[in-house]
């Protein structure tokens, strides 16, 4: 087998690649849990016009390839696709998560997302979050955003409580319960939960609840205001919401 002299003598131009190396390194340090696609979109949003293949080559040379865990947290499923709403506040999925402090004390998070633009509306953190606390969190959200048409949830005790049912009835909010053992029927927030688990709960050791809250608040600001979402045409949730609130801004203005 013979090789052309051009291929045989090729040496990478490290000086030419230096700006790409620097930009990728800075982005990877700023967003340590991002894979290649997200990092590439970060560079694009910074105005970098480097070729996709070139950036990927350097990404691999820098060994930034995201390591996947050998064991999956959830089994492979065939989820039923959810219909994305056409406007804000049509559908809010809500859910609980669990984790623990370094001392072993367990805490819970109450998560609220808007299906329309995947915006995380709240992550409430405490040792215990009863139904009354759930209602207070929802009141805090609707004070700035308005009431949703419906909320989608599982059959947890706080969510099937009379307290939440009365709140929903008073404000004309429909409660939609998924079937027991079918988390894929709430797929949008399940995906959000996985991202939050991977990038925050599994990534940090929390000594106090306040530490968990502060780190989560910083992450929420990044998630809503900086992170491009493929499902939103690589806009951030805040950009997508602004586009919906300002009809004269066409989608092409964000591309």
Model-derived segments and their meaning:
Residues 49-113, 119, 132-140, 144-149, ...:
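Mobile-element integrase/transposase regions
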Residues 68-73, 150-155, 170-188, 204-209:
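RNase H-like polynucleotidyl transferase catalytic core
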Residues 138, 145-161, 181, 233-238:
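Acidic/histidine-rich, metal-coordinating catalytic segments
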Residues 169-173, 195-255:
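C-terminal domain-tail junction helix/linker
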